[in-house]
């Protein structure tokens, strides 16, 4: 059971591991965050102590898992990985915590989805490095305190507002990851191409970067798909022409918007004259979960100025209407 809980998230992304930078100096973008993190890591190494508990937050695909792996690598300690939805019982978390060694890193992805009973176990573990476990049942039940080695909890979330204040306050380091610039994504695409042994010219890398929604995960995924088109058409190195063709075939427009984005924008434009319209109405019309819209569709549309969230609902901007037409 423990093996199913640990490394669940990382195991699902094993094929991506080779594309991830393993050291902070190799990590592209997020310069202010990276600079601060380097100071925190160096200080903890000099003090021979665990890094303070760290909360990483931001939209999906910006490198939260990679940062957790880098922290463990820079500290030269073990990394144990799991995810909030997997930890359904307090005993699940207790089993993981009691197997940690000094200064180890425990990474919990989607930490905002922790069961409240599991979350409460974390409070004493984070503050006092101890667990209070009930042994037995009924009148004979007794509480036993188990002391843990000092460790670092790294939590990752795309929904900072859903994390309870007691849990949020126990993280000594808060790091926000922002969308990447085209220049940063171009470097990431070029590095990924070298790792994958894919030849591409600068214009192709820029084209992929421009359509990647400011997100490295998407950039690397699109690179692989453009590579497939290049192999099929026997084009080497990849150039802007095959890149443009491939991305158009995939339904990715010049700003990186896909069919889901266009459906979202057109629904508001054509049915509500640009808004406002409530998120639940949008979710029902698009047959999507509200969380999916709020986490996967809206962040980038808001970032590029196409959507505004108001008290009355979602409103699309003049720039969005212009793009649709």
Swiss-Prot record:
Residues 254-325 are annotated as: Head domain (RuvB-H). One of its GO terms (molecular function) is ATP hydrolysis activity. The keyword Signal does not apply. InterPro entries: AAA+_ATPase, AAA_lid_4, DNA_helicase_Holl-junc_RuvB, P-loop_NTPase, RuvB-like_N, RuvB_C, WH-like_DNA-bd_sf, WH_DNA-bd_sf. The keyword Signal does not apply. ATP binds at residues 19-20, 61, 64-66, 127-129, 170, 180, 217. Keywords: ATP-binding, Cytoplasm, DNA damage, DNA recombination, DNA repair, DNA-binding, Hydrolase, Nucleotide-binding. Residues 181-251 are annotated as: Small ATPAse domain (RuvB-S). Gene3D superfamilies: 1.10.8.60, P-loop containing nucleotide triphosphate hydrolases, Winged helix-like DNA-binding domain superfamily/Winged helix DNA-binding domain. DNA binds at residues 290, 309, 314. Pfam families: AAA_lid_4, RuvB_C, RuvB_N. Its main location: cytoplasm. SUPFAM superfamilies: P-loop containing nucleoside triphosphate hydrolases, Winged helix' DNA-binding domain. Mg(2+) binds at residue 65. It is an enzyme of class 3 (hydrolase). It is found in: Cytoplasm. Its EC number is 3.6.4.-. Residues 1-180 are annotated as: Large ATPase domain (RuvB-L). HAMAP family: DNA_HJ_migration_RuvB. Belongs to the RuvB family. The RuvA-RuvB-RuvC complex processes Holliday junction (HJ) DNA during genetic recombination and DNA repair, while the RuvA-RuvB complex plays an important role in the rescue of blocked DNA replication forks via replication fork reversal (RFR). RuvA specifically binds to HJ cruciform DNA, conferring on it an open structure. The RuvB hexamer acts as an ATP-dependent pump, pulling dsDNA into and through the RuvAB complex. RuvB forms 2 homohexamers on either side of HJ DNA bound by 1 or 2 RuvA tetramers; 4 subunits per hexamer contact DNA at a time. Has 3 domains, the large (RuvB-L) and small ATPase (RuvB-S) domains and the C-terminal head (RuvB-H) domain. The head domain binds DNA, while the ATPase domains jointly bind ATP, ADP or are empty depending on the state of the subunit in the translocation cycle. During a single DNA translocation step the structure of each domain remains the same, but their relative positions change. This is Holliday junction branch migration complex subunit RuvB. It comes from Orientia tsutsugamushi (strain Ikeda).
